[in-house]
Swiss-Prot record:
Family of the protein in this entry: Belongs to the thioredoxin family. Plant H-type subfamily.
Predominant place of localization: cytoplasm
Active site: 56 (nucleophile), 59 (nucleophile)
Protein name as it appears in the record: Thioredoxin H4-2
Gene Ontology CC: cytoplasm
PROSITE patterns: THIOREDOXIN_1, THIOREDOXIN_2
Top-level taxonomy: Eukaryota, Viridiplantae, Streptophyta, Embryophyta, Tracheophyta
Lineage: superkingdom: Eukaryota
Organism: Oryza sativa subsp. japonica
Length: 132
């Protein structure tokens, strides 16, 4: 499964991606991001950041899988950022397609995955969890 490219159309609030049942922190501001990154550093956690969009089909497919991973790997911190809600912030990460996953340790990117590739996401998350 691939990713969505380009700036999408906005949907109403109820169209937000569903991460229920997981331990995914929804980032709604740069301040939220800074707080969570600081918390992860303090706790020695690796961050998995999912840049996604509510209108993106592959993002909708991977959302419940991402939520499940957040429960399976509590030693990691799972964040999600809606690229339409935080356009400037997302642009600073050079997001070209959604979903894009960044893996961050000690405030530095250690890996990246573009697209809703479940096996590859699971492999990367597992490797980071094993090494944390």
């Amino acid at each position: 499964m691939g990713g969505c490219v380009g700036k999408g159309r906005r949907h109403i609030e109820e169209d937000k991606l569903d991460f229920k049942g997981g331990n995914v922190h929804v980032i709604t501001s740069k301040e939220d991001w800074d707080r969570k990154i600081e918390e992860a550093n303090k706790d020695g956690k690796i961050v998995v950041a999912n840049f996604s969009a509510s209108w993106c089909g592959p993002c909708r497919v991977i959302a419940p899988i991402y939520a499940e991973m957040s429960k399976t790997y509590p030693q990691l911190m799972f964040l999600t950022i809606d690229v339409d809600d935080l356009m400037d912030f997302s642009s600073s990460w050079d997001i070209r397609a959604t979903p894009t996953f960044f893996f961050i340790k000690n405030e530095k990117q250690v890996d990246k995955l573009v697209g809703a590739n479940k096996p590859e996401l699971e492999k990367k998350v597992q490797a980071l969890a094993d090494g944390s």
